[in-house]
Amino acid sequence: MSAISQERLLQVLLAPQISEKATYVADKNEQVVFKVATSATKPEVKAAVELLFKVEVKSVQISNVKGKSKRFGKMMGRRKDWKKAFVCLKPGQEINFVAGE
C-alpha cells in the first residue's frame, strides 16, 4: 500500500461529532466520533487521527449516515449523506475537545 499524502489526511477529518451518543461511547469504550469525508477509508481516518492528535489508534469503525428529508418552505428537500467514524483509542490515550489546547 502506498503512503497516504499529508494533504489528503488533512482533508479526511471534517469535525468531531458531539452528541449524547458520542459522549456515552467516549466514556464507556474510549472511543471518539468524527464526521469524515464521504470518500474516506479506515486507514486514512486512522492515519489522520494519529497525525493531527498525536495519539495511538486501536481500531476504526465507519458508518454511512443517510441525509434526512426536510421541508424548505413549500419544497421538499434532502440533506446530504455523510460518513461517521468511531475511532477506538489504545488504553491511556485520550483526545480532549473541551480544553482549549
UniProtKB/Swiss-Prot annotation:
Signal peptide bounds: none
- Single Gene Ontology MF annotation: rRNA binding
One Gene Ontology BP term is: translation
Q: Name one Pfam family in it.
A: Ribosomal_L23
Instruction: State if Oxidoreductase is listed as a keyword.
Output: no
Give GO cellular component annotations, separated by semicolons. Answer: ribonucleoprotein complex; ribosome
Gene3D superfamilies in the record, alphabetically? 3.30.70.330
Keyword Protein biosynthesis set for record: no
Entry keyword set: Ribonucleoprotein, Ribosomal protein, RNA-binding, rRNA-binding
Q: Where are the transmembrane segments?
A: none
| Subunit and partners | Part of the 50S ribosomal subunit. Contacts protein L29, and trigger factor when it is bound to the ribosome.
Family membership, please give it.
Belongs to the universal ribosomal protein uL23 family.
NCBIfam families cross-referenced by the UniProt entry: PRK05738.1-3, PRK05738.2-4
Primary role? One of the early assembly proteins it binds 23S rRNA. One of the proteins that surrounds the polypeptide exit tunnel on the outside of the ribosome. Forms the main docking site for trigger factor binding to the ribosome.
Which PANTHER family does UniProt cross-reference here? 60S RIBOSOMAL PROTEIN L23A
Q: Which named protein is this?
A: Large ribosomal subunit protein uL23
